[in-house]
Amino acid sequence: MRPDLTLDLGNGLHLRALVLDDAVLLVQATSGEAAPSLWGPRPAGPYSLPDARAALAEWDPAAGGQFSLGVLDGQQLLGAVGLMPGQPGSAELAYWIRPAQRGRGIASRAVQAVTIWAHRGLAIPRIWLEIDPGNEPSLRVAQRAGYHFEQRLPRHCRDWATEDARHDSWHDCLIWSHVEPSTIEPVLVPWR
């Protein structure tokens, strides 16, 4: 991934790679968050500055693995979209929006923009989401961004309540996916 990547979301919003220097923005963005961290092994609720730096170091796009794009309005971080490589030809996408910014369509626009960029810019044919079955807003984001339900996996998603996976709790996840249109076989549908 190019660290200088910027994707325009319209209405003054843009996506760009989050880097170590964005730790303060991440702390500010999560200051009112009571839910678990954005994703991965970070503490519940707000990030401290050391937690934010550790998370951003893990999401370094130069490392070639997982990375995160921030949704920004000027210099205010409104949310983030993470892309985590999976098996060859696929990647998981995760997203988070500040509570005060939810319900404005920001997540749908950001997910759609990163999905299209991942298909075209990174040549990843399949992008998938893991969604808690009770997370209705996230399910609406998936639908609005053009994702399709694939399956329900029992006890597949980790809660990250503890650092040790053996002692953590796990919950069911709904898998939604988006396949790059040029890789889908055309289906002839009779005219009705």
Task: Give the label of every model feature segment.
Residues W59-G64:
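Short loop/turn motifs at secondary-structure junctions and domain boundaries
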Residues A34-A57:
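Conserved GNAT-fold acetyl-CoA-binding loop/helix
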Residues M1-A35, S68-R192:
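Acyl-donor (CoA/ACP) binding surface of acyl/acetyltransferases
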Residues R42, P46, G65, L72:
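Short gly/ser-rich anion-binding loops that grip negatively charged ligand groups
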